[in-house]
Amino acid sequence: MWCLIAHGDGARRRTAIARSVALTGVWLMLAWPAAAQTQPGAADQETVRRLIERVEELERQVRELRQSQAPPLDVPSPQGDLSSANEHNTHAGDVTSPGGGVSPVADIHWFGDVGFRASDQQSDTSSFTVGQLDLFLTSSLTDHLNVLSEIVFRAGADNRYVVNAERLLLQYAPNPYLRVGVGRYHTAIGFYNTAYHHGSWFETAITRPTMFAYRGGLIPIHDIGVFASGRVPSGTLGLKYVFEIGNGQSSQNPANEATQNSADENNGKAFNVGLSANPERFPGLQVGFSTHRDRLKPANAAVTDQTTIAAHAVYQGTALEWLNEIVTVRSARLAPAPDSVTTGLYTQVSRQFGQLRPYFRYQYINASAADAAFRTLGLRHGPTLGLRRDMGKFAAVKAQYERLKRRAMPTVNSLTGQLAFTF
């Protein structure tokens, strides 16, 4: 209530000062020509000087009042706000705190999904499911410093909800050529892992490509550390770089969380280097590659240098989307043990027809039996067919059929439906 009264008093005061400035200005405009027609005396000159000083004083008071009041908050269009949220460059405004200081304001988005899944795999049951509930927040601390947080609520294998801080970043971006971040981030391996995070509403398909799965995929999804990214002066080629260094993945105990949030199990650090191009001549096209290196020290096993190389070529136009990626993981053991290579790839194409977007994906993974981290994947491949229908700007319903062929195992056919939304 007191805030409302103070705000009303400030508004009335600004109105009174503005009225005084206007009346004084009108008086000056009327008086000045008359004074110019005759030889001005000392008294007239003194009167004009005082009036000018009064106007300047009133203008100064108006400026001080405006600075002391909270600036109006910008309300961007919902669609533009959401699209920038996934690119991690949304910045919030500031407001005046009750104590008179300026406090940052968080820009908040929620993403969620519910669905149904059925398959002919013997161990599966048809089930309604509640997917991830994603709380995405950003806040500007200064013009170049911001915080990003992504907290996900999801059901575990025991049907109990667990809460994970999927991303927590403090980012400094003084210019388009440098952005430095520290905290927990999605590794920039390939395209999909940084283009699509934990909000299913952004994704065309219901499921992620297997090699980018949150659990059981080919790449480390998260890491804790420092990264730098930005543009490379390259004219119309549109080059961008990224460099990351972090704790890497846990390997000593399979029961532990893979992402080493609080302590690294060894002194070695993982690093990732990537380069991509967005040529102006081909709008919507991006090609790039990345190399990730980590040293794993599993218990009762040989030390392993794991190198992950990823390459992608994607096109995202107004209607047409075509994603192509390949990932190769080479595990070199520092002992008389054979090295292993695991490869995964996928292609996904879709096209918008009004509110409808049919899509097709084909994926292939050939995991080495000598690699304990991936051997359960084996050889698997198959197509995915689906249809997405946008229900306005903030919700989409999806239906998907997937056929999965596995080496020495029965083929699995599955049907999945999903309602994804943001609010």
Question: Which role fits each region the language model picked out?
Answer:
Residues 259-268, 304:
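Interfacial loop-to-helix transition and helix-capping segments at the boundaries
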Residues 95-251, 267-272, 276-286, 348-359, ...:
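Outer membrane beta-barrel
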Residues 244-262, 294-298:
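Active-site-proximal beta-alpha loop/turn segments in soluble metabolic enzymes
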Residues 20-31:
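Bacterial N-terminal signal peptides
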Residues 121-123, 168-173, 181-184, 193, ...:
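Outer-membrane beta-barrel pore domains
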Residues 1-18:
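N-terminal secretory signal peptides that target proteins for export/translocation
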Residues 8-10, 25, 93:
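Residue-identity detector for glycine
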Residues 2, 34-119, 423:
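N-terminal periplasmic/intermembrane-space "pro-region" immediately following the signal or transit peptide
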